[in-house]
């Protein structure tokens, strides 16, 4: 646990059992390893993090992470979302943390270079308190589904809006459309402020918690990436897509 006390750049994977779309998702098997193990081991390949840890409120997940040799901490069941779970873990276990990356536990194919890029953004610009990745897409299924979040941003990289709808509307099809990838790098002090911002009308309407930041008048900056990630796991049927991707990345659409 010495790493907990000294780590300044921390990656945390919030994990819970009770997903409405896929109960028990963190322990679902993907080619012999669980989803949370694959996501954890993938995050470990980032060169910018001093420590990677799972934060959970479920004893089954905790025991499993410890069993495969990972670091895990228990958090309260009352956490309303993953960000609150991350903040609690940092507050209780990482007194020296300066940058905290909230890494989704259902993204086993996330490129570690994305994590590194976000950390570099915060280290290189003290004015940025929170950064998140986006990637351009021309996939009509990804553009049209409300399960994929779209983002528009200004010339400085400051996010203007996130939506489950198609933005921009793009009648002339000349403007790129960017998908949001749900990873966030926070400056430690701002993470504590973030969880205190109450839900806003737009965040509730879109079911996107990051919109509370924009509605409060604060800024989120985006990191534009290419060939960013493979399929994530939202539903049980996504397991086969991830397995196909891991076996042959070039032949899977998602």
UniProtKB/Swiss-Prot annotation:
Protein localization: Cytoplasm
Matches recorded under Pfam families: CTP_transf_3
Listed EC numbers: 2.7.7.38
Record GO terms (molecular function): 3-deoxy-manno-octulosonate cytidylyltransferase activity
Database matches in SUPFAM superfamilies: Nucleotide-diphospho-sugar transferases
Biological pathway: Nucleotide-sugar biosynthesis; CMP-3-deoxy-D-manno-octulosonate biosynthesis; CMP-3-deoxy-D-manno-octulosonate from 3-deoxy-D-manno-octulosonate and CTP: step 1/1; Bacterial outer membrane biogenesis; lipopolysaccharide biosynthesis
Principal subcellular localisation of the protein: cytoplasm
Alphabetical keyword list: Cytoplasm, Lipopolysaccharide biosynthesis, Nucleotidyltransferase, Transferase
CC terms in the record's Gene Ontology section: cytosol
Coiled coil residues, start to end: none
Biological processes annotated in GO: CMP-keto-3-deoxy-D-manno-octulosonic acid biosynthetic process; lipopolysaccharide biosynthetic process
Gene3D superfamilies, A to Z: Spore Coat Polysaccharide Biosynthesis Protein SpsA, Chain A (3.90.550.10)
Catalytic reaction equation(s): 3-deoxy-alpha-D-manno-oct-2-ulosonate + CTP = CMP-3-deoxy-beta-D-manno-octulosonate + diphosphate
Enzyme category, top tier: transferase
Domain of life: Bacteria
Annotated function: Activates KDO (a required 8-carbon sugar) for incorporation into bacterial lipopolysaccharide in Gram-negative bacteria.
Similarity-based family: Belongs to the KdsB family.
HAMAP family recorded: KdsB (MF_00057)
Protein name (database record): 3-deoxy-manno-octulosonate cytidylyltransferase
Gene coding for it: kdsB
